[in-house]
């Protein structure tokens, strides 16, 4: 019963993976336009989300995480990191700055810092909020953030389109590994969207089996002689450098202390939508 009341009493913070969320809004809705011909699909999705805060979920604090311009340590580690991202549709680019300016006008705080990606900002805020004993809701469906899911400390992802919580069970159901094992899993399978090389020839099933057997990437390589399948062993030996590089690339930095003055992140009480009308 005590733990029940503890959870009821817990303060909660909502962290939005802003670009990820806006991209998804854009592709989820038909290409809407205003009567002047300005594209509005992404902005409509964003407003629906803001209107749902308090209805779809309750939160005490809220923050919008953004990518900083320029490169990060990942580009220094690996020149090709995110090098082949497809071109972003013009309509989407037109709406992004408007959405960001609305976030600020509505009185929400933006988390951005040079050298950090939005995912690193999310990881940093989640870590500090967890240490404060908060419930942490990360608005994103991005698998790169699955490593942060932590049922024991009430850290989970929230898919705003499906209005669905993504917890440890959902992670295991989808990928066959726990959130704590997710970095090692990604290091093996790689990620074509971000140009993470992974181990060439190792797919999801093999990665799951290896992690189930050995737990971590380091442990896999320490026990390389115990791997029965000759082909898998060969692929791992050939891909060792890429595996460890990939692990560095997918590991989120969580050392950017951003919420020391937590009151700045209180959810505004007034109707924020009126501020942009």
Residue ranges and their predicted role:
Residues 5, 46-52, 123-124, 234:
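Short alpha-helical segments and helix-capping/turn motifs at coil-helix boundaries
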């Amino acid at each position: 019963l005590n733990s029940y009341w503890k959870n009821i009493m817990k303060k909660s913070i909502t962290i939005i993976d802003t670009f990820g969320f806006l991209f998804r809004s854009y592709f989820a809705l038909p290409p809407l336009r205003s009567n002047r011909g300005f594209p509005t699909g992404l902005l409509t999705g964003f407003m629906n989300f803001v209107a749902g805060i308090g209805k779809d979920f309750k939160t005490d604090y809220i923050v919008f995480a953004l990518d900083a311009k320029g490169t990060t340590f990942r580009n220094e580690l690996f020149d090709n990191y995110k090098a082949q991202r497809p071109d972003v549709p013009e309509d989407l680019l037109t709406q992004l700055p408007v959405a960001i300016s609305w976030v600020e006008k509505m009185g929400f705080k933006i988390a951005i810092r040079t050298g950090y990606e939005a995912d690193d900002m999310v990881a940093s805020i989640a870590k500090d909020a967890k240490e404060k004993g908060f419930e942490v809701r990360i608005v994103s469906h991005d698998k790169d953030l699955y490593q942060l899911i932590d049922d024991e400390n009430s850290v989970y992802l929230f898919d705003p389109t499906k209005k669905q919580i993504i917890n440890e069970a959902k992670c295991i159901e989808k990928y066959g590994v726990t959130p704590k094992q997710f970095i090692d899993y990604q290091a093996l399978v790689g990620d074509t969207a971000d140009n993470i090389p992974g181990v060439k020839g190792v797919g999801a099933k093999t990665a799951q089996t290896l992690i189930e057997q050995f737990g971590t990437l380091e442990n896999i390589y320490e026990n390389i002689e115990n791997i029965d399948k000759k082909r898998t062993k060969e692929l791992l030996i050939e891909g060792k450098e890429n595996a460890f590089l990939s692990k560095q690339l997918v590991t989120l930095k969580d050392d950017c202390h951003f919420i020391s003055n937590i009151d700045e992140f209180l959810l505004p009480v007034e109707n924020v939508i009126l501020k942009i009308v």
